[in-house]
Amino acid sequence: MIQMQTNLDVADNSGARRVMCIKVLGGSKRKYAGVGDIIVVSVKEAIPRGRVKKGDVMKAVVVRTAKDIKRADGSVIRFDSNAAVLINNQAEPIGTRIFGPVPRELRARNQMKIISLAPEVL
């Protein structure tokens, strides 16, 4: 469950290391984002010579949350940290690699490019 001012790790090689959520997209009064939702983020920490730099405002897809994800079969999945993948305006990932596992709920949200780049889908 991601809301404004939440800090997230970046799970790709775009050059950003940490980002902060500044808006949850999808409705004027929407407060929280979950896995697969698109948010607007500000880059708070970046590596030198990366594709993005500190202070950039970008869109991102939430790929991992510490909050439980409940599945239809009754199972629950949760991650140790909150993480996102930076995307461009065409909803394509900026990085060419994804780090760490991603949940299969992204498939239902039409994030197939992220699913195909991920090393493990849970």
From Swiss-Prot:
Protein's gene: rplN
SUPFAM superfamilies: Ribosomal protein L14
Name of the protein in its database record: Large ribosomal subunit protein uL14
A GO MF label: structural constituent of ribosome
UniProt keyword Transferase present: no
Subunit organization: Part of the 50S ribosomal subunit. Forms a cluster with proteins L3 and L19. In the 70S ribosome, L14 and L19 interact and together make contacts with the 16S rRNA in bridges B5 and B8.
InterPro entries: Ribosomal_uL14, Ribosomal_uL14_bac-type, Ribosomal_uL14_CS, Ribosomal_uL14_sf
Protein task: Binds to 23S rRNA. Forms part of two intersubunit bridges in the 70S ribosome.
Family under the similarity heading: Belongs to the universal ribosomal protein uL14 family.
